[in-house]
Amino acid sequence: MNEVQLEVAKAYPNDSGRGIARLDPDTLLHLKLSPGDIIEIEGAETTAAKVWRADRQDWNTDTIRIDGFTRQNAEVGIGERVKIRKADAEKADTLVLAPPEEASVQFGSDAAGMVKRQILKRPVVARDIVPVMSSTNHPFMRSPGQAIPLIAVETEPEGVCLVTEDTDVELREEPISGFERTGGGITYEDIGGLENEIQRVREMVELPMKHPQIFQKLGIEPPQGVLLHGPPGTGKTLLAKAVANETSASFFSIAGPEIISKYYGESEQQLREIFEDAKDDSPSIIFIDELDSIAPKREDVTGEVERRVVAQLLTMMDGLEGRGQVIVIAATNRVDAVDPALRRPGRFDREIEIGVPDEIGREEILKIHTRGMPLSDDVNLSTLADDTHGFVGADIESLSKEAAMRALRRYLPEIDLDEEDIPPSLIDRMIVKREDFKGALSEVEPSAMREVLVELPKITWDDVGGLTEAKNNVKESVEWPLNQPEKFTRMGVEPPAGVLLYGPPGTGKTLMAKAVANETNANFISVRGPQLLSKWVGESEKAIRQTFRKARQVAPTVIFFDELDSLAPGRGQTGGNNVSERVVNQLLTELDGLEEMEEVMVIAATNRPDIIDPALIRSGRFDRLVQVGQPGIEGREQILKIHTQDTPLAADVSLRELAERADGYVGSDLANIAREAAIEALRDDEDADDVGMAHFRAAMENVRPTITDDLMEYYDQVEDQFKGSQGPNVNSRQGSEHIGFQ
């Protein structure tokens, strides 16, 4: 009989729990198989699966892609080899399923029918784990989209059986013992976007357990500890659970605070016991969650207990006694708070950062969380992945749940909540649409942004009147690098790092920053200068560091510094205080330091460019300096149009004429004129329903223009100095007394 040996690889996210094996076309030809046929997979045990064709990237690779449950049934791991041959499957007359010991499952009234519908046409061998997806309308609830492992206790006839419409499916309530291998049901297929991290953890954890001889040959000790660190919600604990399931090693879990006891010496005793149990049961894995809570830096803690626990952990992990085949995996989101003695080779040899997923990772995670969901055709997961910058796995899970809840709300009016059973016709009609995800997106924000999240202003470029040159400048500097980075790559240049908008008050600098934030779809962090300054030494700099760290984490991001002059005045001048000097230093290192500012754009606005520290205004930091000056006649007319679009105007009103007369008025002045004119009209007649030209003229008498000749001269002078590429001349401040800056 034809058979081949293939290497086991991880299944595609959508195949998890479906009993599918993916083979390349050559193997299918060699074994005379066509898609939909049944094959036997022989590892340490024999199981069966249905064959499908693999994607193009897996052709000619000698691999078979099967999910975690099929791997557990065949008792093989990823990277091991299995024998494949065509199976003679008979129709199953009866199939008896029971939950494993540790699963708590209650079966509802129509549970057997539900399960049968899910496993129709699936091959089963006795003692197989048969995963059943729990969906939102399932009679036994786990979280939707998670597989519940049931065990095939007996099949009639024996051997490879196929579940058909005629099969009698029985469910037994009492759990079946002797099945250690069902685990918590979490496999590598349940983890999206961490391909490299999984690979690194596996070579550290699985290799020493399965093939210790490799390390003996190389004459080295296998690694003993892995520290997973990264922002909350990225999947550190999930990865540890999957590793425990897939390696078939004994698994011991320590939740940080649980082992701390009030009695002297008891915390250390508990820790010693766990390590001793692990040694007796080796090969084994000890997982410590929230490591920073039980092993903080000893110089920072006041309590004696924590110090003793840290010392005990250090001796257990690398003491005089060998600790056998015991690997310690720990997770923390505050890696800098962990005692440095733990972070050396021999204790935690490897530190693996589990970061925020990129676009491809987010799409994988979305596929995992929506695989049990009836999606309508208009849901495009790759566009969704594109819209969820900065989301971690936990945020995406929350997004999927929120979308499903919104879909449910649509059907709620049709459901009679007093009835026990919901009609199957309604359940089959339930579907999650694109609008549900859109609505969910507005409610779920990335968890890393919670402290700094700004509601995105709904302001577009159309709301910014005039200023065409300044607008184009800002678009080139900010929108191109974020939306079309390939332009810069093609030309072989780096995009600008930061943009400084300067100009008289009221010209629309902040408005432009808001429009940019809205148009780029980037995350927007707004920093108001004075908010960052603190009376405690080091706090202001820390706030700036954290702002930039968050921005890098949830990139692409636009950081907007309003009133930069209050935050970064020139250093070394009389009257300057130490705080602002330290803040300037921190800003300089963040903007052009050793760390890359990938996909983070910085925009700042100021109306006093002359007092900003000159080191900030050089290329590589704020390298685009854009003057937002007074609008021309066309611009003023546009601004008036924007501000009077909701105002009923009389027939005699000519906005063009008003624009021609409004020389020296900036955007905020014109907005003021529009408002004053409406109030004038109401003064004349409380029941007035339109605003006439006379009202506008009266309003112009009351509103003074912001811009004077002296002021414009001052800004032109500043611009000339910028173009001469020296920082603004400090002496210009002596002349600024009569310009209106007191």
From Swiss-Prot:
Residues 722-742 are annotated as: Disordered. The gene is cdcH. GO terms for molecular function: ATP binding; ATP hydrolysis activity. The keyword Nucleotide-binding applies. InterPro entries: AAA+_ATPase (IPR003593), AAA_ATPase_CDC48 (IPR005938), AAA_ATPase_domain (IPR050168), AAA_lid_3 (IPR041569), Asp_de-COase-like_dom_sf (IPR009010), ATPase_AAA_core (IPR003959), ATPase_AAA_CS (IPR003960), Cdc48_dom2 (IPR004201). It comes from the Archaea. This is Protein CdcH. Residues 723-734 have a biased composition (Polar residues). The lineage of its organism: Archaea, Methanobacteriati, Methanobacteriota, Stenosarchaea group, Halobacteria. Pfam families: AAA, AAA_lid_3, CDC48_2, CDC48_N. May be part of a transduction pathway connecting light to cell division. Coiled coil: none annotated. ATP binds at residues 230-237, 503-510. Keywords: ATP-binding, Nucleotide-binding, Repeat. PROSITE patterns: AAA. Belongs to the AAA ATPase family. CDC48 subfamily.
